[in-house]
Amino acid sequence: ALELADDEIALCADTTVALGRRILGKPSDRDEANSFLSLLSGRRHKVITCVAAKKQNQVKVKEVISVVKMKVLSFQEIETYLDSGDWEGKAGGYGIQGPAASFIPWISGSYTGIVGLPLNETMGLLSSLKYPVFGSKNG
């Protein structure tokens, strides 16, 4: 276990994509990324990011759910995106903050949550643990 000083905070976050009841994590290879993108093409899906912060014996957790609409993707769009390698390490096989932004006509929720760290909610967690989010010791 990680040892923290009394004034230190451990922060962690992870993101996954849900299409109905199916969870699309980080694809293990190009073929799986292709499968994920083909499934998401033309559909709405949820992006779920969970953030946790721990200070001493206090643990605070926040789940942020956003809805994302992906346009219908052509074979060429998928192949070009896969060739870019941008899908690697990304839940659902795409990153909204990169070239795949052009695939997303609409979102409802937290853009930074979709990217992988919902900033507003993270600041709220840190503030609730009396961590100086703006550089002030007074919070």
Predicted regions and their residues:
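Anionic-ligand binding patches
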Residues: 1-139
